[in-house]
Amino acid sequence: VPSPAISEKMEEFGKRVEDYSARTRAGRIAGYSASIFGNVVLLIFLSFFHQYIAWYHIEPDGSVTRLSMLTSDYFAWLPILVTALVISVAANIIMIIYDRYWFREIIQIILTVIGVVVVANLVSIFPFDFSVIPNATAVDITPIAVTIFLIIVAVGLGVGALVRFIKLIVSLVKQSPS
């Protein structure tokens, strides 16, 4: 029989663990909710307001001219993005309902791989026309800079998916009875 001091410490420890679990679960739900909100905002903006991705020029008479930076190839990439955003929203809703470590990690790995596919397709299709920028140097440099940035994003996402996968495997190996 543990002494009263040890029993109190064990009970206090148990409460702290429960508090921590509740906070982290609440934090994950907040994260899932923020992700859902962000994905819906992106879905709406990039589907219905893409024409505002443009170079704006103020004319001498005060009017504003909007020159689109997107080519018609944007509409070849848009279904890929919309599909990924819808999958992400659905996955985050599912994770709010069912929140287990192994499930969460698998879903996050899948979503990250989908992100790599979306970014890789964006680089491949490259639906941008930077010729509307009035600076010749910027017109030459911007496509290169955007391509490099997108490749770095894709590689970063790929590394993130790999790290999550390794952590998941290590966690599962530690949990399996030997």
Predicted regions located by residue number:
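Short, membrane-exposed interhelical loops at transmembrane-helix boundaries
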Residues: 132-147
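Cytosolic juxtamembrane helix at the C-terminal end of the final transmembrane segment
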Residues: 2, 159-178
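N-terminal juxtamembrane cytosolic/stromal segments of multi-pass membrane proteins
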Residues: 1-37
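Membrane-helix interface motif
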Residues: 44-63, 120-133
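Alpha-helical membrane-embedded segments
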Residues: 147-164
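Transmembrane alpha-helix entry/boundary detector in multi-pass membrane proteins
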Residues: 59-82
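Canonical alpha-helical transmembrane segments of integral membrane proteins
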Residues: 34-50, 86, 115-118
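Loop-to-transmembrane helix junctions at the membrane interface
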Residues: 88-119
